[in-house]
Amino acid sequence: MSFPYSLKPFNTFGVEQSCLSMIEVHSKAELQSTCLSLYQSKRPMLVLGGGSNIVFTDDFNGTVVRVLTKGISCSEDGTHFYLAVEAGENWHELVHFSLNQDMPGLENLALIPGTVGAAPIQNIGAYGVELCDICDWVEYLDLESGNLLRLTADECEFAYRESIFKGCLRDKAVITAVGLRLPKAWQPKLAYGPLQSFNAETVTPREIFERVCEVRSEKLPNPEELGNAGSFFKNPIVSAATYMQLAAHFPSIVGYAQPNGEVKLAAGWLIEHAGLKGFALGNAGVHAKQALVLVNLGHATGQDICRLALHVIARVNEVFGVKLEAEPRIMGLTGETSLDV
């Protein structure tokens, strides 16, 4: 079977796989009609944004729909700014836009790769802020009814790197737009790492934005130079008792207390202290500067990346008794599959 359309330019790992057909959509109406037609035909379909959260382990025996819809509309009331953003907008460019419009609140989420439409699926987050904190609503195409529907943020069932779009709406919904709600009474979020040195009374949104960009640029390789999907593993959440046991054996372990009493561990710290920072397996490697990032060292296949990920998971579990979970979607011949390729 021939797969004439290369996916290499459309996944940030730079994996060389192809697909049967590819369609680019530039309007919401086009996105609706294209996805409904493919869904009703029962042929494999993959809706692709920035390709920054995906690992292709095989050619895709179906149609890839590239979402290139654009548009940002702004409104306000006495207490909030509201942004309605089309799914194909670049996330980081949206953060930049909001700052330039004097609508702060997104600065902690700077330089997260991908599109706005992908952001709610895994409830993107960084430096103490998650999408759920500023999401107002999510509009999506219901593939079964053909209707455009809207969920409030509460209805999206957001959790750490989770949402309803990874649950009961998985493979049944295509996100078309996202609404954001930014308080006019801006409060800096400075709890995490490199932001703690700022003075909450004097810091500006622009300073936070620039610091986040600086830190992410130092730690995360440019996908054009070294293929990657950003953070490959979720930060595992453990009970307070488990954390205390780990801290007794590993006093420098990094953990962040959660509102429910659990503790979120830094997966990068676990990987590094399992001796895997800079480790390579074939053409895939653990990044030498940030152990949370897996990289394509040149001509790596999706299988290479998955094998490395499984090795990292096994080693961290062996050393710490903690099981890591992968963040990116793993795509096989006909759709999403598991890491065990």
UniProtKB/Swiss-Prot annotation:
Active site: R161, S231 (proton donor), E327
Annotated GO MF terms: FAD binding; UDP-N-acetylmuramate dehydrogenase activity
Listed cofactors: FAD
GO annotation, cellular component aspect: cytosol
Coiled coil: none
BP GO annotations: cell division; cell wall organization; peptidoglycan biosynthetic process; regulation of cell shape
Sorted UniProt keywords: Cell cycle, Cell division, Cell shape, Cell wall biogenesis/degradation, Cytoplasm, FAD, Flavoprotein, NADP, Oxidoreductase, Peptidoglycan synthesis
Enzyme class: oxidoreductase
Pathway given in the UniProt record: Cell wall biogenesis; peptidoglycan biosynthesis
Subcellular location: Cytoplasm
Family in the record: Belongs to the MurB family.
Function: Cell wall formation.
Name of this protein: UDP-N-acetylenolpyruvoylglucosamine reductase
Record gene name: murB
